[in-house]
């Protein structure tokens, strides 16, 4: 009779445990999963998606490959994810608000409900300036924009990006005009302000955090209703101190795949979200370090949470004359004032 060595027994037990852990899922991927990040490396979407990818790998026992495909405000990579086979092996990442407003901008035909959403964090934007900037607070910045319409340069990741939508909300509420300078991602937009190419950036706290902590950017306000406590820096006041009537919805980020992938894919990923992502220390630590909110939602819950920012941004773009299609035409209701 053949006997197993103690090492072999240990290996077999380890295999049984790991394979059993994976076997609990209806979908067991047989090849690497690709997540397309439709922005440049180093931005907020890229950062958080890499954290989430590691957790998915651990849960499913399969590699997750991140591919950066920036272009056209994230719509290029998102379209590539949609055009790939709907088999669960190709996903896109980003802000749900971008995903929902692409039809209004004439960039993509697919609407928010055509995608299965798996959210991970909610990010807030920050008004950041170069340390040498003459603007010491939001009031001074807005006064400059009023005095010099269309002259103060603001760097964002592109049309309909989180930074752009945040600045549009401010501009409409304050009645100012600015010079919009776009980049292929939040990180390049932040670097542009650090380097003095632009005067202001309104990209996300997650993208500005390191530069703020290093003293290479000076935050004027968080574009939100509450102060932001940024680890290693301190308190950033809310823009509502100067603009109390500004309307702000929550900006959710995550990954998504077409709704018509095999049902076992969505069932399995829903389980992964409830069991793994919702308890992820790595993701919680990321959120705390980057000034983000931990929001591990999926299914109908994710759709209901995401639609608020989609409505806000779609109508902001339309009212600013930057939409190709009326939100009404693609079923996006105007938010209640």
Which ranges hold each PLM region?
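Bacterial N-terminal signal peptides that target proteins for export
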Residues: 1-8
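Sec/Tat signal peptide C-region and signal peptidase I cleavage site
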Residues: 18-23
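N-terminal (or domain-start) structured segment
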Residues: 24-111, 151, 175-199, 204, ...
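Hinge/capping helix and adjacent helix->loop/strand transition within the periplasmic-binding protein
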Residues: 30, 56, 80-90, 102-188, ...
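An extracytoplasmic/periplasmic, membrane-proximal ligand-sensing/linker region
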Residues: 30, 266-337
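Short coil/turn segments
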Residues: 42, 96, 130-135, 156-161, ...
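Ligand-binding pocket segment of bilobal, Venus flytrap-like solute-binding proteins
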Residues: 151, 155-236
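C-terminal lobe and pocket-closing loops
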Residues: 208-280, 327-337
């Amino acid at each position: 009779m053949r006997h197993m060595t103690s090492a072999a027994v240990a290996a077999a037990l380890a295999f049984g445990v790991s394979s059993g852990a994976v076997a609990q899922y209806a979908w067991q991927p047989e090849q690497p999963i690709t997540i397309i990040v439709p922005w440049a490396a180093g931005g907020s979407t890229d950062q958080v998606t890499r954290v989430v990818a590691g957790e998915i790998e651990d849960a499913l026992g399969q590699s997750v490959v991140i591919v950066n495909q920036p272009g056209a405000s994230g719509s290029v990579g998102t379209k590539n994810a949609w055009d790939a086979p709907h088999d669960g092996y190709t996903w896109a990442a980003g802000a749900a608000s971008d995903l929902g407003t692409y039809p209004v901008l004439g960039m993509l035909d697919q609407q928010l409900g055509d995608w299965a959403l798996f959210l991970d964090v909610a990010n807030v934007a920050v008004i950041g300036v170069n340390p040498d900037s003459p603007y010491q607070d939001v009031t001074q910045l807005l006064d400059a924009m009023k005095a010099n319409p269309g002259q103060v340069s603001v760097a964002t990741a592109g049309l309909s990006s989180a930074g752009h939508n945040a600045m549009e909300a401010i501009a409409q509420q304050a009645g100012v005009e600015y010079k919009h300078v776009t980049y292929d991602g939040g990180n390049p937009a932040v670097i542009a302000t650090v380097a003095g190419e632009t005067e202001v950036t309104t990209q996300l706290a997650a993208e500005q955090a390191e530069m703020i902590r290093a003293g290479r950017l000076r935050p004027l306000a968080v574009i939100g209703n509450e102060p932001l406590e940024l680890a290693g820096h301190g308190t950033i006041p809310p823009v509502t101190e100067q603009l109390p009537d500004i309307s702000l919805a929550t900006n959710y980020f995550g990954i998504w795949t077409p709704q018509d992938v095999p049902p076992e894919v969505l069932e399995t990923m829903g389980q992964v979200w409830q069991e793994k992502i919702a308890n992820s220390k790595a993701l919680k630590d990321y959120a705390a370090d980057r000034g983000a909110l931990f929001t591990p939602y999926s299914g109908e819950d994710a759709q209901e949470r995401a639609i608020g920012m989609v409505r806000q941004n779609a109508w902001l773009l339309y009212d600013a004359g930057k939409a190709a299609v009326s939100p009404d035409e693609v079923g996006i209701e105007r938010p209640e004032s």
